[in-house]
Amino acid sequence: MALDKFYNIYGLDTSAFYFDDEMALNRKLDKAKRIKSKCKKRQELLLNSCGDVRRKELISKQKRTLKRVNRIIRETKAELKDLLADRVGLERTARPEAFVPTNIISTFDSDLARCFELKSDVINEEIIVVQIYFFDVAHGLALNGFTYNGNRYCYFSSSAGQIRTKKMVFVREDILNRVWNRLTCGLTVERINELGGVNPNKYLAYLALCNSATDKWEKFNIDKVIVVDDMENIVHGVVDFMDDKDYSINRQEMDLPFTQTDGVGMARRDVIKSNRMFRAPWMKGLLARFAFDDLIREKGWSPIVEDIYGVKHDVLAEDIEIILTKSQFKMWSYFDSWEQYKENFKKYGCSAGYCKAEEDWIPNAKTNYQMLQTLTDVTNRELVTLASKTVNKISNIASDKETMVSMFGVTPHSTNLNAFQEALTLYPELLADPYTKEQLSSAKKAMEYSAWCGKLDIFGKYTFIIPDMYAVCEHMFGGVANPDGLLADGEVYCGLFKRTEKLDCVRSPHLYKEHAVRKNMAAERSERDRWFDTKALYISTHDLISRILQCDFDGDTSLVIADDTFVRIAERNMEGIVPLFYNMAKAPKSIITKQVLFDGLVKAFTGGNIGLYSNSISKIWNSGSITEDAIKSVKWLCMDNNFVIDYAKTLYKPQAPENVKAVIEGFTNAKLPHFFVYAKDKPEESVELRNSSCVNRLRSLIPRKNLRLRFPMMDNFNYKVLMNNPNIEIDKEVIRNYEALVVYASGVLTNADDEAAVWFYYYSKIKNEMLSMGYPESDIVDMLVKYYFHLRKSKRKVTLWNTFGDIIVDNIKRNLDTKFTTCKHCGRRYMVKDDENGLCSECRKTPPEMKVGYRIMVCQDCGRDIGINLTNTRTVRCPECQLAERRRVRMLCERERRKRGQKEF
């Protein structure tokens, strides 16, 4: 998969392109900031040390120092800004000292990476990502590019995510010129400008599609693909219509236009085995697996369909495999015909990629605080019920093997396991190692924090949202203008929950009350089962649900919740709630030039922070009593948030009237909700006191538990299982060299932006350095294992696992006969025969009712095997011996009491 393959590249910031005098000022600024940080730390330490008089003197001195440092920072920053402003547009050269390991970042496999032939075992210099801090420097880079190591680099594009984080992607100009037609299917900027231009930020986003993480679609055949018009219809319903001029809100019935295939197309069942997202030059979206060919034949519909250029196609005669829609082909109007695109696709060696394919098994998910905070009338009993799965999981971390290994991502459905995960699967006794125990303790604390901020395990799954494709085919091939489809208003179909009649469909970000409680038609056996044969959430073309969820269908997912308690609460809270509706602005076109692209980027960088709106809405939902003004404020902020999201394209943001601002500020001037201590690691002084809002109550309803890790169902951990030669003598020089390399890498890591990328780079470097010592790899691994697992019993082994984990796994496989496995009840190893349900011969003899959720334990008094609950770590005797023990203790206590009474007498 694309997310499993990545390449190391450099991620710089604008300081990497400073001239010498600018760099001198930058270093002076950095030094002043370090001094400021130290002064603040000293000031905090002084508050709890020294006598009163001496403490006041030292604090006063630190304040004077801070004042001088702040003045230096202001003056130096102003001088640097003036210097940069005088040099706007100058051509710059990357400073060689910027290309150091701390500036390594990783990029996933993509069409861009494949075109530039990036390699996974080196640091690639063909693509460089630049973080923007000063626009004056970025201006020159965008217009002129830069030079490094004798190569010219030019600005390529920025994805939506990179725009949010103020990043620009630069590539080697000579390579880009060579592969441009392959990336763009022959479309040039000159051609775009001839046809009137395009919105600059849309252009950047569409060009950046080739930088999406994808696998190459080897069997993609462009000759078996067509592009047709989207299905559009009118849906009548009640909405809260919001005016973006005067901010009035009116509940009214409206006929709303919907593009029912916005971002989604179809692929035959024999072409893809599940729904998947795809990318091609200027194309993106979701491909829904749907048997449109079988449906045409069964219904006797005409197989003739017209493409977006007016050419008719017989999808059966032409053996069409994939039908895309106009909304997926972003630059369709700049090609003369579909034939031209196909010819260019083949001529220039273009390719398609896919990503995020629907998994064979979808795990249950977690809620988040946004989904919970809009449920404003939840009782404590209901909250306890919702949190019960999470509480049980936290408790089971202490003693249940399955829960323990699942904390490391090891489940029966796990794929692409790393070395440590594979070792746990083969040798679960590894859970008793100090490193693993330390990780479990950290995981338990993290789970508690997650639970306190609303991340609760729920009976629900994330899955793609897809419109009723049967209705789409009725419209496309049956000629029905407004087809009925297989789903009516208020109905959905999700085959993941065939026994659940009602579902709550939610989506992030979840700002207003956006719980779409719908009837699940998968609970009824019908014709729908034949056509809706994937795990997606299918929605009706007569429903306002896509307006509630604020979704399109280009790969958007919904958390579909089937938990009865949650659905009941959501349905109750949605009484009287209707979708919000407002008219969004259109994005204007521009002639594309380097200056226009940079201006568009600056507007996107400075257009607004959507996080501010989300946090403001959280303040309102957690403010206490939810009044009418509170609800109105949430609606206004939701509208503002969506306009800010589109601001980079539309350059339009509504301005709230003063009276509206006053109402909103009455809520948003407060501090953040208390649970942000756990959700965003905020300090206590920056949040409100804990009140009785839904999410805030979780802290008191889920108390912290001090759990002692126990391993009652496993044999003792033996470090020799991880070794090839347990009798090896340790060379201290090997240990010293390894520790020196780890310490050096850790020091580099403290200044790195992308910690994971830097570590993976150093894992390879550490391994090569160790192998250069002259010992065989197996001997080096044995020495390290013996030292860190046996002699030192270290709690820090992440580098060892990521450097030599594959060798350790091979040793485990060699030392443990693969014909043996551990019994999931008693932990004993036994020989695997046929289907034994994971039980050894002794446990298979136990009664059926004891096989689920029970394990076998030996009574410490009589030695008899007894079945106890998996989570029970206290029982040590069978019931008969425990009763006898209680009698014995009672008799001893009675005897002691009588003795004390006689002495007192």
Language-model-detected regions and their locations in the chain:
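Beta-strand-enriched accessory nucleic-acid recognition/scaffold domains that flank the catalytic cores
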Residues: M1-Q550, T557, D563-F905
